[in-house]
Amino acid sequence: MELKDYIATIENYPKEGVVFRDISPLMADGNAYNYAATEIVQYARDKEIDMVVGPEARGFIIGCPVAFALGVGFAPVRKPGKLPREVIEATYEKEYGTDTLTMHSDSIKPGQRVLIVDDLLATGGTIAATIELVEKMGGVVVGCAFLIELDELKGREKIGNYVYKVLMHY
């Protein structure tokens, strides 16, 4: 299946000069959505995953079906003020500004093997902050998976030696 057929391209969104890759058509097609999630599940099967972690909001959309298929839990990464209990946080640079991400401080147990799932790898700020959060709790990041990588933004440089899977490159 050619997943790029299910990605809408929007020029100059959310600001002038940005090309936005919209995954909504992929999610709206059950076969394409299932195919994408299954590809990530196949990548993760031999990694002995204990927990899937996904940044808000589209990391939830991709990460939850992956966690379900793997038979493991899902831990959300949220913006400040969105989680009701004690949190840890990490600040990062993104494509158009700076942001902070949080997780409940008990989301990951020391030694748990974690797969991080998100829709997009752009500048790498979100993934770097998510890795930092998981590792602050003693988790072991055993892989990362993305629907899309924007190659020219070089986000892979922030992943370092972490193994990762990408389904589509732009």
Swiss-Prot record:
Q: What class of enzyme is it?
A: transferase
Give the Enzyme Commission number.
2.4.2.7
Q: Which UniProt keywords apply?
A: Cytoplasm, Glycosyltransferase, Purine salvage, Transferase
**GO CC terms on record?**
cytoplasm
> One Pfam annotation, family name?
Pribosyltran
What's a single GO MF annotation on this record?
A: AMP binding
Q: Which PROSITE patterns match?
A: PUR_PYR_PR_TRANSFER
Domain of life, per UniProt, equals Bacteria
| Enzymatic reactions | AMP + diphosphate = 5-phospho-alpha-D-ribose 1-diphosphate + adenine
InterPro entries named in the record: Ade_phspho_trans, PRibTrfase_dom, PRTase-like, UPRTase/APRTase
Q: Which pathway does it serve? A: Purine metabolism; AMP biosynthesis via salvage pathway; AMP from adenine: step 1/1
> Which GO terms fall under biological process for this protein?
adenine salvage; AMP salvage; purine ribonucleoside salvage
Q: Which CDD domains does the entry mention? A: PRTases_typeI (cd06223)
Q: Where in the cell is it found?
A: Cytoplasm
Q: How does it assemble?
A: Homodimer.
Q: Which purpose does this protein serve, as stated in its record?
A: Catalyzes a salvage reaction resulting in the formation of AMP, that is energically less costly than de novo synthesis.
Q: Which NCBIfam families match?
A: apt, PRK02304.1-2, PRK02304.1-3, PRK02304.1-5
Report the family membership. Belongs to the purine/pyrimidine phosphoribosyltransferase family.
For this entry, the protein name equals Adenine phosphoribosyltransferase
Question: Which species is this record about?
Answer: Lactococcus lactis subsp. cremoris (strain SK11)
Gene name linked to the record: apt
